[in-house]
From Swiss-Prot:
GO terms for molecular function: ATP binding; metal ion binding; pyruvate, water dikinase activity. Substrate binds at residues 550, 598, 699, 720-723. This is Probable phosphoenolpyruvate synthase. It comes from the Archaea. Homooligomer. Forms a large complex of about 2000 kDa. Its cofactor is Mg(2+). Catalyzes the phosphorylation of pyruvate to phosphoenolpyruvate. It comes from Staphylothermus marinus (strain ATCC 43588 / DSM 3639 / JCM 9404 / F1). The gene is ppsA. Keywords: ATP-binding, Kinase, Magnesium, Metal-binding, Nucleotide-binding, Transferase.
Amino acid sequence: MSNVPKEKRFIVWLDEVTKDDVVLVGGKNANLGEMIRAGIPVPPGFAVTAYAYKYFIEKTGLKDKIYPLLNSIDVNDKKVLDETTAKIRQWIMDTPMPPEVEEEIRKYYRELAKKIGMEPEKLRVAVRSSATAEDMPEASFAGQQDTYLNVYGEDNVVYYVKRCWASLFTSRAVFYRVAQGIPHEKSLMSVTVQKMVNSRTAGVMFTLHPVTGDEKVVVIEASWGLGESVVGGKVTPDEWVVDKQTLQIVDQKIHHKTLAIVFDPKKGKNVEIRWDENKQAWVSEEGPVDIEMVKHFHPDKPALKEEEVKRLAELALLIEKHYGRHMDIEWAVDYDIPFPDNVFIVQARLETVWSVRKEKEKAEKKAEIKGKNIVKLSEAKVLVRGLPASPGIGAGVAKVIFDPHSKEAQEFKEGEVLVTKMTDPDWVPLMKKAVAIVTDEGGMTSHAAIVSRELGIPAIVGTGNATQVIKSGIEVTVDGSRGVVYEGIVEDLVKPKEEVKAEVAGVGISPEQLLPLYPVTATKIYMNLGEPDAIEKYKDLPFDGIGLMRIEFIITDWVQYHPLYLIEQGKESLFIDKLAEGIAKVAQAIYPRPVVVRFSDFKTNEYRGLKGGEKYEPEERNPMIGWRGVSRYIHPKYEPAFRLEVRAIKKVREEMGLTNVWVMFPFVRTTWELERALKIMEEEGLKRGKDFKVWAMAEVPSIVLLADKFAEYVDGFSIGSNDLTQLILGADRDSNILAEMGYFDERDPAVLAGIKMIIEKAHSKGATVSICGQAPSVYPEIVEFLVEAGIDSISVNPDAVIATRRLVASIERKIMLKRLNKIMDKLNKLELGF
């Protein structure tokens, strides 16, 4: 190592660098050095220091030319900005590098080759910028300076180091610094020179979900070849979501990857290859592709093996642990090296979006609803879907633009929706004007996604065909939280949100004041709801979802007609649309919290009360245990009406993009009826899955006895304590006499024993258990029993949400203390020799 103080050296090895050297080597290099010291597999290399760059511009006199010129211009004048920055970059490239700096770069390149055991002229390296302000927590500056891959030979390395220095003065970099309030004089440039990984697969990963901010997962994006295709948003990459605790893959999306960037050893350069669907082969503009590694690529094949996904997740957690912060990481898998040594980390930076985001959502701006084509959510046509890259709602006139320097780009107005194939840093001035952004290509960590989140602009990426489907000049609404673009201005989504106070149970405080007051509980606290409009009053209460959404109110108040009557009149759409509108109102207001919608549970006498109902409903002596629940859905006479309910659910989930809606079957008596009802759902296109849960009400004693059998058909149960008490005790819930005598009591030992049986049997099969009857809202002692029995969630009336959450937290603490005391007693006995 050199005797010259580190801060005065032109070059330092990466393994000499620590996080304290950010000023000298920039954020990227400092992070690489930190990871090497932490034992993370990082390709070897060296850093051309910021001091070398500073020495260059001072010794050559460029400093006195560059900064006065830059500080004299208006960066919002794009023409002047482009001309000025181009002139500065040319000055840098035309000015010879001081010999003492150039020779150091050549020397270290030769030494790197020697360390690796390669001939210098054959050593391929990545030459990357590492600006001293680039990785500040306040701004990610995604793609601000240049990166050059597969560079080889001393002359080329020297040339591309200068190119990196010059990239400090692109229009986009200058614009960003001004926008972030960073003085140009304080922005210096270090350069990474690092051995290239022969990338079979490359990509990015986050140690939290980049869209939702979920801290319990690692999100990995991958595609074939070099990572430039992923980072640059040129391809929609494969995606894996990995649970941090178990390292199990909890979600996986394999996309059609038709583009890759690879190094062609015969041509000695990187080439962009595309999948030819007709030839079923990879081709480039220069003809057929004859690269050994590419033979293993296929557009629909996962770009990573499961073992590689888990290895990457392990490394992500090590890096996160080392820094104590959420991280944004670039990685590559080497084609020539066997697993697990083939996985390398090539960059890591602090995650910048969720790190600085407060509770406010910039994306959801308060604005008057303006537009010619104003529609309701239930009537809105879905134009395209994509990956929800930046949350929020944006609505306005769409403009399809393919070139950020085109006439169309110059005419782009503030408040319009930008629709394009993909973005790179040249698009930033346009992006800042946009009310929302939609791209054909890219993943959640593409340039469009990163910058949109940083700017607080709703964005959807990877739609595939937005530029073809969306026409310039039409009004659209972009839902960046769900990845859906609607035609028209959807008033339900864009209307101003007023401050809503939680005036429940005597609580009259704002959501901001309320949030810190409630404790976190292991047992989920859900809320029961019947009237959709009431969600505006209650949505800011501390509940984890809607555990029971009754649709009977929507049918009686919004639809009013018997569904079979509407079918006979040819007005099925009225029923579907109204039901969908009511459900969507609730699901939209609390997204992404789940909404468990119970299919209709009218009794025959209640159905007769609907307009036109008398024709279709028999008169029963005991409707409470008569033709209700699932028995109606599978009956040939009523099945068409049940199908309307299923279609409404499907519309909410698939057309409106509200995938937080689940369903629940009421009054389930047998497994065979449940099986038949599920089959009808499947025929209508709704099938149980990872993101679509199906529950059953547990209110008939047959479920108590056979919960483990019923669990084969559903994901969870919700105990209806009212009907369950009635049927276990044989006590009519509507009988005042029996109630006064104390017969109808959910706390009866027989009822509690039945509830405990349901929980135990359901859990033995992996099903969850909730309760949505009135008991928890009325009897605190039942809540304690339920928590101790291991129930997964408790759904209560709005006025009981806060009290129940606090009660559950207290009970959970008491249970933990009991267990701790037992452990301590055992330890004490062991120490005393008992």
